[in-house]
UniProtKB/Swiss-Prot annotation:
This is Protein-L-isoaspartate O-methyltransferase. It is found in: Cytoplasm. One of its GO terms (cellular component) is cytoplasm. Belongs to the methyltransferase superfamily. L-isoaspartyl/D-aspartyl protein methyltransferase family. Its main location: cytoplasm. GO terms for biological process: methylation; protein modification process; protein repair. It comes from the Bacteria. Keywords: Cytoplasm, Methyltransferase, S-adenosyl-L-methionine, Transferase.
Amino acid sequence: MLSRSMKDLLTMLKQHGINDERLLEAMSKVPRELFIDEALSHKAYENTALPIGNGQTISQPYIVAKMTSLLELQATDSVLEIGTGSGYQTAVLANLVHHVSSVERIKILQWQAKRRFKHLDLHNISTRHGDGWEGWVSKGPFNAIIVTACATEVPQRLLMQLADGGRMIIPVGEQQQMLKFIRRLGNDFHYQSIEAVRFVPLIAGELA
């Protein structure tokens, strides 16, 4: 039985053009209040980004849904996520695909996210404390890559971890950020600009 707040969230997503029933069902299975501080739980189903500590945020539900829908995910897919953060986006992905490999540079966030995945009985997720710019070579190649922090440029190491036909969604830019969709076809990469966004920066090398 879905709560009134969850129903309202799903209705809002539909009004914003999110009509993929598999995606909406996946989001309905992930209680957003588990991924934020208890003091902010009254805002859990608002369409807004919220702080999760360590200078990081949980993205607004619309952006989570939009980025996920652009990846054209199949149940058999293997997905790389750069920036586990709270784990909310990871959990949505895990309800849609065969396996999610997620990299987080802040150890405490990785640890907290792993506890949430266990609580939700999600066992098709691997997490790693590492540099997102490097990806996770040994787990690849990936059918899809989602980057949840803004890079100054598209990391070449991530492009090389896309399988043929693979899709990537990534915010790129400095003062002005643009959500980019990239599809790999053989050794060619096709780029498409989606919309202006606002994400925390994808920091290279500095593990915390």
